[in-house]
Amino acid sequence: MLNYLKYMIRVPRKFILNWAISGGVYLLILPLAFANSSVESLLIDTQREAFRGMSENDTAMSLLGISDWDNVFTLEGMVTTYFLVPFVPLLIGTATIILLNKLGSKAEEDGTFEFVASLPMTRSTVYLSQAIITVLFGLFVTFAWTNIMFIPIATMELSQTLDYGPLMKATLQAALAGVSFGALGFALGAFTGKSSMAWAFGGGLMAFEYLTNSLSGTNDFFQWVDDLSLIHISEPTRPSSI
C-alpha cells in the first residue's frame, strides 16, 4: 500500500503543484484590494454600488446565500461569499475528478498499470489508498491557496484583516466539501462503468446542494439540508480595521 501511495503522489506532482501555486497567487488580489483606501474605492466600492440593484432582488440574494449585501464587499465577505463557498468546492471537486482520472490514464500510458496490478493489494486497499490521496490532495491545495492569500494580511497594513485560526477552520470545511463532491462523482461514474459520467454526477450533486441550500432559507421543506450541507461554510471572522 505504501508503494502505491508513493506512486499516486509521484505521478501527478506537477499537476498538484500547478493547482496549489497558481491558485494561491491569483487569490492575492483579494487582500491586495484592501491595500489602501484609493485601491479599495476603485476595486471594491465601485463594484458594490454598480451591482446594488441586485440586493433588492430577494430571489437572487437567496440563491447566492447573501443576507447582507454590504458585508459581501468586505475582506471577510470576499473570502467567504466569493471564494470559500462557491469556488473552492467547485474547483476542488473538478480537480479531484481530474486527478483520479489522471492516475488511471497515466498508469495505462506509461506502462505502470501492470505495476499497480501486480501489487499485493485487495480492491478495498486500492480504493482506500485513492481515498487517502484524494483527501490529502484537496486539503493541500486549498490550504496552499488560503495560506498564500494570507501573506499580505499578515505582512502588510491593510484596511481590513482576518484572523488566521477561523480562516483555517473555514478552509478545512470548504476543502472537505470539494473533495466529497469530486470523490462521490468519480465513484458513481466508476460504478456505471462510464468515467465521463463522473462529471455529470459530480456537477449534479453540487447543483443539488447549492439549490437546496438556497431554498432552505425561504422554504421550510428544505430546512433539513442546512444540517447536512457540505458547503455550509462558517465565516472566518468579522473584518476589523487597522
What are these regions (language model features)?
Residues 97-117, 131:
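Transmembrane helix boundary and interhelical loop/hinge segments in multi-pass membrane proteins
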Residues 32, 128-181, 185-186, 190:
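Secretory targeting signals
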Residues 232-242:
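Residue-level detector of conserved catalytic or cofactor/ligand-binding positions
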Residues 115-123, 237:
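Short helix-to-coil transition segments within interhelical loops
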Residues 80-105:
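Long, hydrophobic alpha-helical segments
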Residues 96-100, 112, 148, 183-184, ...:
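Hydrophobic/aromatic residues in alpha-helical transmembrane segments
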Residues 4, 11-12, 24, 29-77, ...:
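Terminal transmembrane helical anchor/hairpin motif
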